[in-house]
């Protein structure tokens, strides 16, 4: 409705402002003002509608277990999304029992691997993955497993992974990119190093980082707990000395039990070298970890 716009009085007060021509900006263009072309996200040729969902459809409908194995590539940006939607539509927020629908994938995953995965859906990927892994995670389980021990030292999950996650579990057997777990409100995640701006605006959940973090860690974090195993605790505290962050030791048995449980699950799913080393000397875990709230 550009017909409701008019020149501001501020644009007549000075010689330069008065010279600005705004007529072409507020001219009402001719033509329809409703949508003329339907959006087409090409889901009909995507991975989920052609492979995972058809394979798992009857198991979802009947609540039975299903396991499938697939090779995927970085052009497929819907892995697990349609299947997860089908679970949520039929079973609502409760979803299915854990690991009911279990998909093994391998290769170079595209964006949004296992996005919005609900409870009952597990995606176990061996390889690497682009941005937005597990974004909006809603109760499901996501595993990104390095294909070999050398890859554990590299970035195998892209930027903005687990953005807005609310529930669920994730195990990343390598490093992740920037803005990891921002706006996480309830997911429990293990990763082996992250880039800048990690855990921004986090409000809930638990994140264990078996390695170093980038700059601006925990900015705006107002809830949840993270346990960091940096190469140097002293350096970590120095670099990340924000007024909004509180550092402390892990003193209570309940906390140690939680860390051990998450690391055991991480090792079970990924055979992580770092997790194994920490578990082998877990009686001294307080010396290697810093709690951040």
Predicted regions and their residues:
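Long, distal/terminal scaffolding or interaction modules
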Residues: 3-293
